[in-house]
Amino acid sequence: MKKNRIITVVLILVFLTGASLLLYPTVSNLWNSFHQSMAITEYTEQTEKLDRKTCERLWADAESYNKKLLDNPERFTMTDEQKTEYDQLLDLSGNGIMGYIEVPAIDCSLPISHGTDEAALHTAIGHLEGSSLPTGGKGTHCVLSGHRGLPSARLFTDLDELKEGDVFILKVLDRTMTYEVDQILTVDPYDLEPLEIDPEMDYCT
């Protein structure tokens, strides 16, 4: 009798372990989606509370930063001082969120975080340091990076479903910027040429 109980307990534990492993991706994705939605809601509420003067100053600082990038061939290699300046731009609450991206074709809405460290990329889309801040306008090339295929978060998993002509939207402070996909290519991490800034164009990669 005692032996049968032990076998039953072991079988239950094996079942629970298996069920936990099967449910982990779904539960984890739901949890991360909830926090992403909360981050976007919090960001939206904060921007709505901004007075016009503060909003204009934040935009002016970001646009000034972008102009400096045009004349900086070493912009992807930051000094500590430059990193500190970068982290403070478009950061309303000190949590590193500078806006959010919407991709209607794949029903995706995600916060955009400063930098592309692993902590940020597990829960948000990262903005590549050294690329233009998402202000739009000529002479800017904003580069965003996100994980695909993570078991714990959907993020950019469905990005390969996009096709030329689809649009995506960046929402930063009080502005909405809509971009159209004009080409799809794979960028080598060591080849920065596709990320160059064209003084006459407004790009987002």
Language-model segments: residues:
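Solvent-exposed, non-transmembrane regions of membrane-associated and secreted proteins
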Residues: 5-9, 14-205
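N-terminal Lys/Arg-rich, disordered targeting/topogenic segments
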Residues: 1-3
